[in-house]
Curated annotation (Swiss-Prot):
Tissue expression per record: Weakly expressed in testis, prostate, ovary, thymus and small intestine. Expressed strongly in breast cancer cells.
Protein's name according to its UniProt entry: RAD9, HUS1, RAD1-interacting nuclear orphan protein 1
Localization (cell): Nucleus; Chromosome
Motif D-box per record, residues: 125-132
Quaternary structure (record): Interacts (when phosphorylated by PLK1) with POLQ; promoting POLQ recruitment to DNA damage sites. Interacts with RAD1; interaction is direct and promotes association with the 9-1-1 (RAD9-RAD1-HUS1) complex. Interacts with RAD18. Interacts with TOPBP1. Interacts with UBE2N.
Gene name per UniProt: RHNO1
RAD1-binding motif (motif): residue ranges: 55-61
Function, in words: Involved in microhomology-mediated end-joining (MMEJ) DNA repair by promoting recruitment of polymerase theta (POLQ) to DNA damage sites during mitosis. MMEJ is an alternative non-homologous end-joining (NHEJ) machinery that takes place during mitosis to repair double-strand breaks in DNA that originate in S-phase. Accumulates in M-phase; following phosphorylation by PLK1, interacts with POLQ, enabling its recruitment to double-strand breaks for subsequent repair.
């Protein structure tokens, strides 16, 4: 199909100008008539001192905006702006008086101490051992712990003394009685008594039979003997 011809938009006509106001007032009922202003009040004016009006402004911001951001001039040697150069910020950076403290210093307990930096290849070749587990810390030697990049430093906790002396003082009969009492207490708790049975289980020979005929077994047997009831009528559709 040939392309459609582009129609020129009709030029907007200028609004009609009325040299005289309507004699009967505004045509719309919702519009209110404007009364001439007759009562005017004269308020004493105070001259503005431009030297003191900006006295509270910081001197860093006294520079005019035009000097910082000159107006863009079109068609002015675009080849110069093709290669962008790193520009420095026109405003100074903010400086903080006190350095920010890390979260570990606020806690007061150094949990992890970083060892001297090592290459990533050496660290990746080593076997993965959970350093923070107490069993691995007990089995590993001091040199192996020092060779790892991160070492767990446990807090100062007093370990209890060995109870070998106390075990010698306890007789053998008392030990056996305590073991029997522990096994009795740690057994499975007594299960609560079952409540009343709300719905009985369906026997296997009645699976697939509709509830209506399951409750009327004598009627179901009578109709099946007479051949007046098909299987699709009393069996559940699967």
């Amino acid at each position: 199909m040939p392309p459609r011809k582009k129609r020129r938009q009709p030029s907007q006509k200028a609004p009609l100008l009325f040299h005289q106001q309507p004699l009967e007032g505004p045509k719309h009922s919702c519009a209110s008539t404007q009364l001439p202003i007759t009562h005017t009040r004269q308020v004493p004016s105070k001259p503005i001192d431009h030297s003191t009006i900006t006295s509270w402004v910081s001197p860093d911001f006294d520079t005019a905006a035009g000097s910082l951001f000159p107006a863009y001039q079109k068609h002015q040697n675009r080849a110069r702006h093709s290669s962008r150069k790193p520009t420095t910020s026109k405003f100074p950076h903010l400086t903080f008086e006190s350095p920010q403290s890390s979260s570990s210093e606020t806690l007061g307990i150094p949990l992890i101490r970083e060892c001297p930096s090592e290459s990533e290849k050496d660290v990746s070749r080593r076997p993965l051992v959970p350093v923070l587990s107490p069993q691995s810390c007990g089995n590993m030697s001091v040199q192996a712990l020092q060779s790892l990049p991160y070492v767990f430093i446990p807090p100062d906790i007093q370990t209890p003394e060995s109870s070998s002396v106390k075990e010698e003082l306890i007789p053998q009969d008392q030990k056996e009685n305590s073991l029997l009492s522990c096994t009795l207490h740690t057994g499975t708790p007594n299960s609560p008594e079952p409540g009343p049975v709300l719905v009985k289980d369906t026997p296997e020979d009645k699976y697939g039979i509709k509830v209506t005929w399951r409750r009327r077994q004598h009627l179901l047997a009578y109709l099946r003997e007479r051949g007046k009831l098909s299987r699709s009528q009393f069996l559940v559709k699967s």
